[in-house]
Amino acid sequence: MKKLAAFLSLALAACASLPSTPPALAPVTQPATTTASMPAETRQPVTILISIDGFRPDYLDRGVTPNLNRLKAAGISASMRPAFPSKTYPNHWTLVTGLVPDRHGIVSNNMDDPTGAHPPFTLATDDPWWWNAAEPIWVTAEKLGIRTATMFWPGSNVSWGGVPREGGHGEVDGATRPRDWQQFNQSVTGDQRVDAVIDWLRRPAATRPRFVTLYFDTVDSAGHASGPDSAQVTEAAADVDRLIGRLTDGLAALNQAANVVIVSDHGMAATSSTRTIALDGVLAPADATIGETGPYAGITPTPGREAAVAQALAAPHPHMQCWRKDRIPARFRYGGNPRVPPYICLAATGWSIVKRLPERPFSGGNHGYDHQSAEMRALFIAQGPAFVAGRRLSVFDNVDIAPLLRDLLGLPAGQGLDGSDAPFRKVMR
């Protein structure tokens, strides 16, 4: 996505720069404890899940990521297939639930409730109704007494489960969240995010989390603004690598063993105004409502115009395919959820679907394309006491990450998940 929006009211402006004096991190739900006050102890390994939004695996080959490459050499790695659509919110929810978007319900970054009972879903939506079809791993862990903390992750601010409060406008009673969580705020720098995680781990064992998430958005932002092959993406990758080094140094200073799992949600493809498909040249405006556009588009026919829409979308453009939702090819594992629009049109990788031709030329990057395309591949590195060193795995699907995390935390195997821990069984100690 172009920039991860605030989970409640904060939205990110494209290409926004960080302030020279960032605001202090909002208070966590438990105060940090200084190292001096901690008794000597043998620390139980923690699991840290890190998302570097929009980081393609081949960014590791640019010579600017020594810390990531060191972890790769000391652990296991692979190119990972995202779920379709290769967008931020659907894939972040897949990573922590083990379900494809069609089953967990976050089928796009922007959605409409087909019943009309709820306002449209946007990047700021925290109404549990949208999220509660699948249980994220921090909820499973908290239910079993494992303390968790999230330093930004889509959906981690949402109250999971519980009973809707009458007249509460989406508020619930008796819900579960991570014990410590942060409302997303782009002005919180990468250094502050890392330091907050280290502060959590500095606590005594009774209040120290055993599962932590950490999220970085700058590589994705640079990819959208300047394209995946740009110097700006290389600079952003170098800075995130520096932050990974800051984290590992902090863990070493605490003598804190950690199984670190580093992922991205999707890759990035170069885009240009010379590769656009204008829907106003395919459909009469009165025939349909156009939803999200870009690498793919959702289309809802106007009542009574279904036949006209079906005919127009039968062979719409040499660089775009369209399907009625019940005829989307099975390999996408998409189309069964009622939140998916009646028609989905998918552009060829690098092409953009727009409502009308742009008035000004543009270039940059985007994602949301066929999840099996090479440009959409995601990053995977895992290193720590649970993993053997220096093993390269075959490509696997990101639905397998949640089962891996369950193994690391000692949680029961999930029932009815779309993924499994099979890719990792031979490379874990």
Language model regions located:
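Loop/turn elements at helix/coil->beta-strand transitions in domains of secreted/extracellular proteins
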Residues: 43-47, 74-77, 103, 143-149, ...
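Positively charged n-region of N-terminal signal peptides that target proteins for export
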Residues: 1-4
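Structural recognition of the beta-strand scaffold that forms the well-ordered cores
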Residues: 47-51, 78-81, 94-96, 139-140, ...
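Metal-dependent active-site segment of extracytoplasmic phospho-/sulfohydrolases and closely related
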Residues: 49, 67, 239-279
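Active-site nucleophile/metal-coordination loop of metallo-enzymes that catalyze phosphate/sulfate
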Residues: 22-44, 56-144, 159-161
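His/Asp/Glu-rich, glycine-adjacent segments
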Residues: 99-227, 354
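Active-site neighborhoods of enzymes that stabilize oxyanions during catalysis
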Residues: 291-404
